[in-house]
Amino acid sequence: MAKDTFLNLRNQIIYCIYVRNHTPEGTFKAIIPDLQRIKGLGADIIWFMPIHPIGETKRKGVEGSPYAIKDYRAVNPAYGTMDDFKALAAAIHDLGMKVMIDVVYNHTSPDSQLVEQHPEWFYRRPNGEMGNKVGEWYDIVDLDYSHPELWDYQIETLKQWATIVDGFRCDVASLVPVEFWVRARKEVAEVKAGVVWLAESVHPSFLRMNRDRGNIGYSDSELYEAFDITYLYDVHDFQQAYFWGEISLKNYLDVLLFQDGIYPVNYVKLRFLENHDHPRIRSKIDDIGRLRNWTVFAYFQKGTLLLFGGQETATAHLPDLFEKDPIAWTGEEDLTPLLQRLQRFKREAAVREGSYDLKAASESETVIGQYRFGNERLTGIFCLDGKAAKVAVDLPDGVYRNQLDDQEYQISEGLLETRSVPILFKSYGEALLTEV
């Protein structure tokens, strides 16, 4: 984490919007009527996937990838005007939320404004042609940060956007010099204090591949010099391995706790079950009870929580990144009541500053998690396989109320019957507390 990172980011929820597919209209204006609902889900920050004009050369699909940007300082005319975006940002601010935009500084579209004006700022293949270092990204060309003038231009762009927005989610931040990000953070702070910096840090395997090819690649530890939050991709492969039965629950939880020992004491991770690069969690989980357990477990983990637009409907369909594919807001299940209860838990001081532990039950796929802060305890019990189990819980015997559904549970001789639903208890020392 950067030295001035605010720990309260661990209490916060980011809601991600892809403007093209959030509404049938696919415009900035069409989002405004939905803001109150999003606020009700507990969103503190709304992150907009790239809002800029999209290149036409080598475009993927009909509409193109929003990550193949033509002009960093303009907005996509299909979404509206700059004034429309400013009005949207103002409406978000009026509701007490912050605005975050995507910053895609590793590359541009092949027909970008910078390609036309400054071709010398781009990576060249051995044959002298512009290109990219990741073959499947054929609709983009990589920037070359050995040019100081490029740094100046990019930082000036960020400073301009900082007059409108409150945060930056930086795409494949690991592939851009960390020294650039450090300088950018410092200079942007002179325009607006408290800007939130989120790094899309990458999977270790992708990092190794780039380093093996002689390209730069920065780890999460290095990125924390400039960023407040990094992605959970350092443990994502383990999450997937557990999900598909390749490793034990204990192995997975050990890796999650390993983060607590290798990062600074006030590190912040972005916790999520899905995003635009990965399948919807519902496409992997048919059982809604199991889905609820995984959802609550994601909220419980230490860090900022990401909700990907539409996740609240428990839909299995991931909107197409390259085409018009609006979210169907009438999903199979409305998770809104659950998410509304979870936001109250997420605000707890113990989640921000307490000690944190995760244990695997001995004979079931159940997680027992606990935060301790002073004499306060927040205990979570999650049946990741969706099955009821009897588990040992480190709490005094007695009756506890589940903060998620107000049902009472008896702990007797240190054991509890889970009933297969996610559970959150709050207690103070030996005294039990039945309401948040």
Question: What spans do the regions from the language model cover?
Answer:
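Carbohydrate-interacting/catalytic domains
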Residues: 1-47, 53, 86, 90-91, ...
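Substrate-binding/active-site clefts of carbohydrate-active enzymes
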Residues: 2-32, 36-44, 50-162, 183-192, ...
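Hydrophobic faces of well-ordered beta-strands that scaffold small-molecule active sites
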Residues: 13-15, 46-48, 99-101, 168, ...
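Short, flexible loop/turn elements at secondary-structure junctions
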Residues: 19-23, 52, 76, 105, ...
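Short, solvent-exposed turn/loop segments enriched in Gly/Ser/Thr/Pro and often Arg
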Residues: 47-60, 102-111, 171-177, 200-204, ...
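Short, surface-exposed connector motifs at secondary-structure boundaries
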Residues: 162-169
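Active-site-proximal helices and loops of the catalytic beta/alpha 8
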Residues: 171-264, 269, 297, 316-350, ...
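Active-site clefts of carbohydrate-active enzymes
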Residues: 263-286
